[in-house]
Swiss-Prot record:
Belongs to the phi29 phage major capsid protein family. The lineage of its organism: Viruses, Duplodnaviria, Heunggongvirae, Uroviricota, Caudoviricetes. It is found in: Virion. It comes from the Viruses. Assembles to form a prolate capsid of about 45x54 nm, with a T=3, Q=5 symmetry. Keywords: Capsid protein, Late protein, T=13 icosahedral capsid protein, Virion. This is Major capsid protein. One of its GO terms (cellular component) is T=13 icosahedral viral capsid. The gene is 8.
Length: 472
């Protein structure tokens, strides 16, 4: 985000002269009612004489300027932040957001005889849940000395410099960091192999994509993501969903955008150029090597503000004010949302791009069983995958209870049954892992699920076998 200038103050407050900023403060704070409104730039120095004679008024002036007037300017200026469009709103209470997705239910074959015994049998909705926690809790500190304030009222130009400097320093720092963290969400998601990968050809000498191929693949991807019947192919939880065309965005680096015709790219979204500009977001670049663009549903980003507040403290001994801007936010991504990464094909040395174990997060009542599935996504369609291994890891069960839990794969290893052999009085978590050996590069790609074994509090405690003493 660019530096905040005096012109930004004028545009935000709807004024034409710098001294009108002081008038805005006079009108905002009743403690300045004894001051007359300024009529010209020369009145700035006269206002300063009266202000500098009263420490209480100085404190009120700076507080109103930084906290109230400055915040209006910043919110106006921040609309230029390209990733601000993904903000969801404010988290009023707590520190967590629960995201719920209800997937499709399975069909049943009509059978009158079976109906006699199953008419009252429950079928629990296929509900999946993710949690997003507040993960940014920081503050920014700015010191304003008596001497700075005194200098600011030397003339109108010094006042302009004072305004832009203090607001730029504290608010702009927070906003630049937020933009950087939001971009980092994309790279973190990519590093965890959570994007659906679409390879694109890139000139090794220039690093520029083959524009004809890139346009064809973006058009095809946008079409598939927005088909009315939906699909499981474009999100990392393999839930059945779709994206409305109005909710589809492409984020690309400036170098890629420079080579791609905007009109042709707009046609991939079935939009004219003017409407498409709002769906195309340009950034300086991705941290991940080979990542050229991402196409995401607007719900991919989970961005919430919780605290954005200024606090102040006067240090009488040091003759300065300290201002603290506190920023608390949720910065996360939704694994339910469709998200595709366009990646340099030369950097993709394998065929297996992703292994998803479903349910990815779930629960199993002890003494029961749970059907699980491995979804293996590949770069090349219809690749034959033979080396698939299911395994189980203990996370929170006692060793005795863990011994009653097992995982057994089906014949083709695309699915498995997680079995809790008997009711457990305590319960805990297990991790189900699927390891797939890529047939192209022989590397192992892993997917995992976290399953909670729900206890039965009426169950008999399981005793850990005790080895008999030696010699008996």
């Amino acid at each position: 985000m660019s530096r905040i200038s005096i012109q930004d103050f004028k545009e935000s407050l709807g004024i034409t002269e710098s001294y009108d900023i002081i008038n805005a403060i006079i009108n905002e704070n009743p403690r300045f009612s004894e001051f007359s409104t300024l009529a010209n730039a020369q009145d700035v120095a006269n206002f300063g004489i009266g202000l500098l004679a009263d420490k209480t008024l100085q404190n009120d002036f700076i507080h109103t300027l930084v906290d109230r007037i400055g915040l209006v300017v910043v919110h106006h200026k921040l609309m230029q932040n390209p990733l601000k469009i993904f903000k969801k709103g404010t988290l009023e209470y707590g520190r967590k957001i629960e995201e719920i997705f209800t997937d499709l239910t399975r069909e049943h074959v009509y059978d009158p005889e079976k109906a006699e015994t199953e008419v009252f049998k429950r079928e629990i909705p296929n509900v999946k849940t993710l949690f997003h926690e507040r993960d940014r809790q920081v503050f920014y500190k700015q010191t304003i000395s008596d001497q700075q304030l005194k200098t600011a009222f030397t003339n109108a130009q010094k006042f302009d410099e004072f305004l832009s400097t203090i607001v730029t320093s504290i608010y702009n720092s927070a906003e630049v960091d937020e933009f950087r963290y939001t971009k980092l969400l994309i790279d973190n998601y990519f590093s965890k192999n959570l994007f659906k990968i679409v390879p694109v050809s890139v000139d090794p000498a220039t690093g520029i994509v083959n524009t004809k191929e890139f346009l064809a693949k973006t058009r095809a991807t946008a079409t598939k993501m927005t088909l009315p019947m939906g699909t499981r192919d474009f999100n990392s939880m393999a839930v059945h969903t779709r994206t409305d065309m109005d909710d589809l965005y492409i984020i690309m680096d400036a170098d890629t955008q420079a080579e791609v015709d905007v009109n042709e790219l707009a046609s991939a979204f079935n939009l004219n150029k003017a409407d498409f500009i709002g769906r195309r977001i340009l950034i300086d670049g991705f941290a991940s090597t080979g990542l050229k663009a991402v196409m995401v549903d607007k719900d991919f980003f989970m961005l919430y503000d919780q605290v954005f507040r200024m606090e102040s403290q006067r240090n009488a001994q040091g003759m300065y004010w300290n201002y603290y801007l506190h920023v608390w936010q949720v910065l996360s991504t939704s694994r339910f949302a469709n998200a595709v990464a366009f990646v340099d094909s030369a950097l993709i040395d394998g065929d297996v791009s992703q292994v998803i174990v479903t349910p990815t997060v779930g629960s199993l009542k002890s003494g029961k069983s749970l059907d699980m599935e491995a979804i293996i996504r590949t770069i090349t369609p219809n690749v034959q995958i033979e080396d698939v291994e299911w395994s189980l890891e203990n996370v929170g069960l006692s060793s005795a209870e863990y011994a009653t839990v097992s995982i057994t794969a089906n014949e083709n290893k695309t699915g498995a049954k997680l079995v809790s052999a008997q009711p457990l009085p305590v319960g805990g978590d297990v991790r189900v892992k699927v390891t797939v050996t890529d047939p192209k590069n022989n590397k192992d790609i892993e997917g995992e699920a976290h399953i909670s074994i729900i206890p039965d509090f009426n169950a008999t405690p399981i005793q850990t076998p005790v080895d008999p003493p030696s010699g008996e």
